[in-house]
Amino acid sequence: MAKATSSLVVPIIFLVIFALVEQNTGCFDYDVYQPCDHCRERCLKYYPVTRKAICRKNHCVCIGPCPDDKAIPDVKLFKNVKEQILS
């Protein structure tokens, strides 16, 4: 019984680690084949203001929140609608 329990510990640890890493990483959008001149302006042209522009290996990189992060306020909105209907 102890051997069966110990064989489950490692996969469970990896599942927890992968779940946490996926939640904490930001989204990267590479603007490849473009030099780093005016990188911030290029990020503002294609992405929202919440993105940060940096230069990596002579390529402009726009880093910021994932599109899924915008869904969180929508949940609060639906909650308020439900409260309005019930009142």
UniProtKB/Swiss-Prot annotation:
Its main location: secreted. Disulfide bonds join C27-C66, C36-C55, C39-C60, C43-C62. It is found in: Secreted. Keywords: Antimicrobial, Disulfide bond, Fungicide, Plant defense, Secreted, Signal. GO terms for biological process: defense response to fungus; killing of cells of another organism. GO terms for cellular component: extracellular region. Residues 1-23 form the signal peptide. Belongs to the DEFL family. This is Defensin-like protein 176. The gene is LCR65.
